[in-house]
Amino acid sequence: MIGKSLDIGSSVIRFFSKNFYTLILFALVLISAFSSIWLFYFEIVKDTNPLSSIPAHIVKTLFDAMVLMSPFFVVKRRGFVFIPLILLDVFCLSAVWYYRNYLDIIPFSSFLLYENLTPLLLESAFASARWIDCLAIVPTLMTGVLYKFVLQKKVQKERRRLWWPVIVILSVFVCFHIFLSVRDIKSKQYDSLTDRFVTFPNNILYFDLNGMCGYILYHAATSLLPQPELTEEETIRIQNYLDAYPRYADNIYSVNENKNLILIIVESLNSWVIGKSFCGEEITPCLNRIVNDSNSITAVHVLPQVKDGRSSDGQFMFNTGLLPLKSGAVATRYDDVDYYSIAKALKRRNYTAVNMTVDGNNYWNQAEISVAYGYDRNIDRLGGGTSVTDSVLMERAIEKIKVQKTPFFYQLITGTSHKPYNEPYRKTKLSGATEFPEEVRNYMEVIHYTDRCIGAFVDSLRSNGLYDNTVIAIASDHNQLLSPCGVPGYNDTEAAFIVANAGVKYTHTSVMGQIDIYPTLLDVMNCNDYAWKGLGYSILRTPVGSAAGWNGTVYGNEGDSLASRQIEAWDISEKIITKTRWLN
């Protein structure tokens, strides 16, 4: 017995002596990986769930770092380990920046959207950086320097494949997670060993439960495995859900028969700015005039229901009446579906549908998805090769509209008011509102600019004799979280929906969802004979007082009679998009 113990001890000593510098490099790589994952945990998970156990996550993070870096032992060129290490750093850093803007983990599919890497997007990302983010950069840089100038030649002399450390690491990792599952079963938190890996409310809490490796494995599996066909039970459920919607085909706003429709989707428009003045300057004088007009619809308590697709998710809801995916962007994952849409509803009446954007066709896959929505033309890159300002968009739109055969439907997608807000955009008196943080003041300035562009556009419609025969709908693509502020009335969580020349005066004072915009527009445009009215409700017909987020949270009146259906709509929409292909 003693002899065997001595033999084992001698073997361990020989292993360490033969692989001394290799193990030093692995320790440095391990520290670097641990540092990046810990940044992810501390800035995202701990911020979301203050009750998350730090000691438990120290152990999880250590195991995750060891597993992710374990290929180090089986490649003879140890320097290759910097490839997964740098990829891990990039993911963790991107996730932290994404979270600071959108309060969620960036989906892996977003890294394939290289077309979205515009200077504006990069500037927005860098604006989210903080000094603590060095945790994802400095350790890797220091490890790289030490490897290059101190360890490389010594590690190369020890070059050999070592399988048993990998086997030990993976075995301990699996045993650790089995232990966690057994513990959860004993505490009656879950019923089976696999429950913790498939039952979770959101991505962040999934990471909290299962760590980085569990998170990566789960999303890899769900992305690569084929989507199952719609079952008979699911088909019946969808049909029963749709059958319970109000059925109507009457058009109560006949004054809008064959009127043109212009839908302006405003980047990052928070509704609290509407009607507000500071330092003697209105933030949104144009929108204020529309809101106060006797022929307009106003809703300033709109719940943003966008998910990973952000701006493209807003467009998706307004165009199709479906909710976005809970993971990934519809615009890039399901761009080949022939959706029912407002463009197709109008084209039955000989409308021409045109989409215009300040960005390129490749941004959020505009070229493909606009075809799926039924647009006849998609006009992009108005500046030749780069994004343009909102003023250029509006000027070019007027040029096109003046010679456009009527009736027409134009969708105009703005972009100047995109984050970051590092400096005032065309400074006005609003910059003197020192009761607000600098970021909020700069935000007010750029929204003021976009509002002026919309105002000039509306004035051009009037001067060209087009206004009276045109309905103008204005909707926020999503809200924009800004610096915390205690000024009364400040709210960066609600979006806006406004319709000028609507044929009716209506102010929706309670909460509604972005999903309710599509059926409301059908109502306004006298398209109620179109079979597909979406998964929302026209606020002109139904007393909507609530809306549901993707995680099942109800906003507004939680006891609203529609609340349970609004929650279920997310699952119904997901199945329609991913399983039925929803062919028109």
Task: Name what the model sees in each region.
Residues 2-216:
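Transmembrane and membrane-interface helices of multi-pass
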Residues 5, 9, 16-17, 227, ...:
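Intrinsic-disorder-associated interaction segments
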Residues 50, 55, 71, 84, ...:
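Proline-rich intrinsically disordered, low-complexity coils
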Residues 97-110, 127-130, 231-234, 311, ...:
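A diffuse structural propensity rather than consistent per-protein peaks
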Residues 215-240:
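Membrane-anchoring hydrophobic helices of lipid-metabolizing enzymes
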Residues 236-584:
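Solvent-exposed soluble domains appended to multi-pass membrane proteins
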